[in-house]
Amino acid sequence: MRIMKCGIAAMLLAAAGCADDSMPGGICTASFATITVTVVDRQSQPVTGASVTATLVRTGETLVPTTLMLSVPGTYALVDDGSTHLIRRSGDAVQASISKGSQSVTADYVVAVADGCHISKVSGPDTVSLK
């Protein structure tokens, strides 16, 4: 019986450590969400080495992804769970500016933290083409 009480107490303590202040009583998973964009050229080939900047339109703040480099050529992280404290649960506009050499494109996104834990894309393109 004593072992069972200790086990239950340990589980409750572990779960309490995962609770998110913006979601009273809620538990966040250990997953780490990232919103990505694939950048292609006029021939629909992946573009590597592009400069990608995501800006939170409401504040003008640059959102810096905390994820490591992605291993898919032409795919870039825009926003990840490292920015959940900046994004409204109901959603925020994010503008992505992407360039390489003389070519550039901007794309508009809406991202949210609807569950109080993880970034999710409400709208915006999966792929953009440099022009």
Show the residue positions of the predicted features.
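Short beta-strand/loop motifs in extracellular/secreted proteins, especially
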Residues: 35, 48-52, 92-94
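Sec-dependent bacterial lipoprotein signal peptides
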Residues: 1-18
